[in-house]
Design a protein with these regions (language model features):
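Short solvent-exposed coil/turn linkers within tandem alpha-helical repeat scaffolds
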Residues: 145-148, 161, 178-185
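A non-transmembrane, solvent-exposed segment enriched in polar/low-complexity residues
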Residues: 25-145
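Helix-turn-helix repeat elements of alpha-solenoid scaffolds
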Residues: 132-135, 162-169
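N-terminal "domain-start" segment that seeds a small globular fold
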Residues: 140, 186-220
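Short active-site neighborhood of thiol/selenol oxidoreductases, capturing the structured segment around
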Residues: 218-236
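Bacterial Sec-dependent N-terminal signal peptides
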Residues: 1-36
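Alpha-helical repeat scaffolds
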Residues: 138, 167-175, 203-206
Length: 236
């Protein structure tokens, strides 16, 4: 090939590689950065805990140096997390983790956590103290913020066991479709399914348990007979 033609081919190839590099960089997931200050602990450890299945589970930790700490990572969706200096603490200071650069100031002994740089945390901070008050209506939050991850979180955490089936379905129908695949909305769907399964007139959920002789007995195998089922809590 003539030298001029070869140069043209090299330039085209280089431009293609450069374009692919730019595109791949643009597709990189944006992560979160938490820059924290803690006023009641100078040095030690701080634990990041994820709210899951009605409890907080430690997923990361950072060293506290001269009252400051830092977390970095990527989250797949905005979810509730907690911060604590006690690894086994069941009541960390709660905030919403999103892929943003956030500034945190905390004092665990006084139960104070302020978060700046995240709009979702502004909404969480506004509503967290209200949802525990008598007379708070979750309907108003759903009506005003149907697309915020904060809304289904409060439904799951504070209202799932207070609402009947029709009330839960009504709230679910008002949530924005963009939340359909998120963790908290999936949990709401699970609550609705379980409530539907135990409505009067519905077929009872099947289960198998050993009888007094240790033989397995399945509820569906007793269909057509009079059956008395006695349930009690595991801690009784």
């Amino acid at each position: 090939l003539p030298i001029l033609e070869m140069k043209r081919m090299v330039n085209v190839l280089f431009a293609g590689v450069l374009a692919m590099t730019v595109l791949s960089c643009g597709e990189e997931k944006k992560g979160y950065t938490l820059n924290g200050e803690i006023s009641d602990v100078k040095d030690g450890m701080v634990y990041l805990k994820k709210y899951q299945d009605k409890s907080f589970i430690a997923v990361d930790s950072a060293v506290i140096t001269d009252g400051t700490f830092k977390f970095e990572g990527v989250c797949t969706e905005p979810l509730a997390y907690g911060l604590t200096t006690f690894r086994d603490s069941k009541r960390p200071l709660v905030f919403f983790l999103d892929n943003e650069k956030m500034q945190l100031k905390m004092n665990e002994s006084e139960k104070i956590l302020t978060v700046t740089g995240s709009a979702i945390n502004d909404l969480y901070a506004q509503n967290a103290p209200l949802t525990r008050q008598d007379g708070y209506s979750i309907d108003s939050l759903v009506a005003v913020h149907p697309a915020s991850a904060v809304t289904p979180y409060f439904i799951v955490k504070d209202f799932a066991y207070k609402l009947n089936l029709e009330e839960m379905k009504a709230l679910r129908a008002k949530l924005d479709a963009s939340l359909d695949e998120t963790m908290y909305v999936s949990q709401i769907d699970g609550f609705i399914k379980r409530m539907e399964d135990i409505q009067v007139g519905a077929v009872a959920p099947d289960f198998t348990l050993p009888d007094v002789d240790g033989n397995p007995v399945t509820l569906s195998g007793l269909r057509g007979k009079y059956v008395l089922i006695d349930f009690w809590a595991s801690w009784c």
